[in-house]
Amino acid sequence: MSENSTPERVVLLDEQHQPTGTALKSEVHTEATPLHLAFSCHVLNPDGRVLVTRRALSKRTWPGVWSNSFCGHPGPHESFEDAIARRARQELGLEIRNLTVVVPEFQYRATDATGVVENEFCPVFVAVTDTDPQPAESEVAEYAWTAPRDLIAAVESAPYAFSPWLGDQVREPALREALG
C-alpha cells in the first residue's frame, strides 16, 4: 500500500521501455511477471559508508537476504525523484539528498526460490543522508553501514546471501565509481 492507503500500481513496459499500462503491484509479481518500471537506490552517509539492508523475513520475494539500501516502483505519473524520496521515508525513515542516477539503463530478471519472478527496468541511483535509518519492520530486518569495497567483496565471495539485483549492480563500473 502507498502512503495514502490506496493500492500501489506499477508501470508496465514494452521491450523498448515504453509504458504500456499499469497493474496492481500485489498482482504483478508472479511466475510470469511482466517487465515493469522500478528503481534501486544506494545511500551513503557523510563518512562514505553505504547502507545495506536485510530484507524482512515476511517479504514475498527474497526474504532475509541482504540488498542495497532500498528499492521501489514509481507510480503512474510519479517522477523517480518523488518515488525515491517517498520510499526512503516509508521504508527507512530517511531524508535523502544529492540523488544521482548512476546506471540509467539497468535491467534484470531473476526468479526466487518460490518461483516468483522479478522482471524490472530499474535505473540505479545513489543518494546521501545525514541520519541513521528508522526501518519499517515490514520491509527491513536489519541494516548496516559498510565500506563500499567491503560490500563488493562480500557480494563477490558469497553471492547467495545477497539479492540478485545487488549482485548484478555491484558489477557495474559506474556504480563502483559512484560508491567510491
UniProtKB/Swiss-Prot annotation:
Alphabetized PROSITE patterns for the sequence: NUDIX
Record's GO cellular component terms: cytoplasm
Cell location: Cytoplasm
Amino-acid positions noted as binding Mg(2+) in the UniProt annotation, renumbered to this chain: 91
Signal peptide: none
The UniProt record lists the keyword Manganese: yes
Active site: 71, 120
GO molecular function: isopentenyl-diphosphate delta-isomerase activity; metal ion binding
Cofactor note: Binds 1 Mg(2+) ion per subunit. The magnesium ion binds only when substrate is bound.
Pfam families per UniProt: NUDIX
Cofactor(s) named in the record: Mg(2+); Mn(2+)
Catalytic activity: isopentenyl diphosphate = dimethylallyl diphosphate
GO biological process terms held by the UniProt record: dimethylallyl diphosphate biosynthetic process; isoprenoid biosynthetic process
EC number(s) reported in the record: 5.3.3.2
Annotated pathway: Isoprenoid biosynthesis; dimethylallyl diphosphate biosynthesis; dimethylallyl diphosphate from isopentenyl diphosphate: step 1/1
Main subcellular location of this protein, as a coarse class: cytoplasm
Domain of life of the native organism: Bacteria
Keyword Nucleotidyltransferase annotated: no
Residues annotated to bind Mn(2+): 29, 36, 73, 118, 120
Alphabetically ordered keywords of this record: Cytoplasm, Isomerase, Isoprene biosynthesis, Magnesium, Manganese, Metal-binding
Coiled-coil residue spans: none
Family, similarity comment: Belongs to the IPP isomerase type 1 family.
Described purpose of this protein according to its UniProt entry: Catalyzes the 1,3-allylic rearrangement of the homoallylic substrate isopentenyl (IPP) to its highly electrophilic allylic isomer, dimethylallyl diphosphate (DMAPP).
Name of the featured protein: Isopentenyl-diphosphate Delta-isomerase
Lineage of origin: Bacteria, Bacillati, Actinomycetota, Actinomycetes, Micrococcales
Gene field: idi
